[in-house]
Amino acid sequence: MANSASPEQNQNHCSAINSSILLTQGNLPTLTLSGKIRVTVTFFLFLLSTAFNASFLLKLQKWTQRKEKGKKLSRMKVLLKHLTLANLLETLIVMPLDGMWNITVQWYAGEFLCKVLSYLKLFSMYAPAFMMVVISLDRSLAITRPLAVKSNSRLGRFMIGLAWLLSSIFAGPQLYIFRMIHLADSSGQTEGFSQCVTHGSFPQWWHQAFYNFFTFSCLFIIPLLIMLICNAKIMFTLTRVLQQDPHNLQLNQSKNNIPRARLRTLKMTVAFAASFIVCWTPYYVLGIWYWFDPEMVNRVSDPVNHFFFLFAFLNPCFDPLIYGYFSL
């Protein structure tokens, strides 16, 4: 997960090892073959996601230039711009950090970067999830309350700003709970093996459990529920319109009808939600399993563990493909 609760960190980042525990040289983590494959795939996805998201930002920039010539940038394109920025931020922070950390196994960057990068990692994970919530809410309101959305142009900007603000606030505890530890051998002598972990930051075990559940809820459960509710409301509204008059699905801008462009953005919103579920569910299922059964690390093979966690890196790669497919 985003902190020391994950089995991925337990295996590869030694985050489940407290600095007071004595280790032998043979117990220290190493870079395995499956770890090397994971690193290779991670950096490949990093290049892919960077290229896709940067290309879409350039395309949006061209639309922005057209806006200066009198063509207004649509509300949906503004939302897509911020989602792309959030995806690019996640790509540039999380993927290189994960790849390099798996290569080095231990932490060499010092305590300051341990705290700062842990904060930036969680911030860059919150931002895309919250932007997905904003898009789902905006599209739901555009269908269920079109006149209210059209008359309130500030609502979209407010939700976007709130998403960025909450991302920065909710990631704040990372600056406090992460720290460097130095592990010792069986004789008590320091071996020079250091790690960036959260151990010793929580007075009681349930404090860490609460923090883990909070981050899990904000990163996955709450966004997922909001997206499902919004998409259900959209489908219900569309079904009701079609039941009243099957010919209502016309290509005009009447408040009672659904223009084709809006239908296209609705399909894209559903595709975003599906991508979010497919990519993040394996990642969090593995994390939750570890919370309730830490010994699962010894039962789940290393390749399976790495494979499940790589799913999360597919999400920022898929989103630009979804943009392109629906040709906004």
Curated annotation (Swiss-Prot):
Ranges in coiled-coil conformation: none
Recorded superkingdom: Eukaryota
Subcellular location field: Cell membrane
GO biological process: cellular response to hormone stimulus; G protein-coupled receptor signaling pathway
InterPro entries the record matches: GPCR_Rhodpsn, GPCR_Rhodpsn_7TM, GphnRH_fam_rcpt
Gene3D superfamilies: Rhodopsin 7-helix transmembrane proteins
Recorded topology in the membrane: Multi-pass membrane protein
Annotated GO MF terms: gonadotropin-releasing hormone receptor activity
Listed PROSITE patterns: G_PROTEIN_RECEP_F1_1, G_PROTEIN_RECEP_F1_2
Protein name: Gonadotropin-releasing hormone receptor
